């Protein structure tokens, strides 16, 4: 996946390369310390996108989801400091991903910095 924290501020493309937005934070699985979710500013709102399968390609991060799926994702009212519980389950259902590897995920920079990026 490359150096995930350096992805903050990087453009995000969907699985076919269409622009989605910019990474404004990375959420790590608290149990494994692995990146689990990317907080992306789409210019319209902040959305969380699974980090699994994301690849660094040139100066972009490419995620394995269509832009339409990302645009339709449930969005937090404000960036959470920790992603867990029902919000995590709603996102997992939306993207069709398993969440057993991420019982709780903490943001690298936290909600204040991510909110500034919005």
PLM features: what roles do these ranges have?
Residues 1-118:
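Peripheral interaction segments used for macromolecular assembly
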């Amino acid at each position: 996946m490359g150096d995930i924290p350096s992805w903050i501020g990087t453009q995000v493309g969907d699985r076919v390369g269409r622009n989605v937005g910019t990474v404004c934070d990375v959420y790590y699985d608290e149990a494994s310390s692995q990146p689990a979710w990317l907080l992306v500013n789409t210019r319209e709102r902040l959305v969380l996108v699974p980090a699994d399968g994301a690849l660094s390609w040139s100066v972009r991060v490419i995620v394995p989801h269509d832009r339409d799926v990302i645009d339709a994702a449930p969005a937090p009212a404000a960036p959470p400091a920790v992603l867990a519980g029902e919000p995590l389950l709603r996102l997992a259902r939306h993207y069709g991903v398993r969440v057993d590897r991420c019982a709780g995920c903490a943001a690298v920079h936290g909600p204040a910095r991510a909110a500034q990026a919005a």
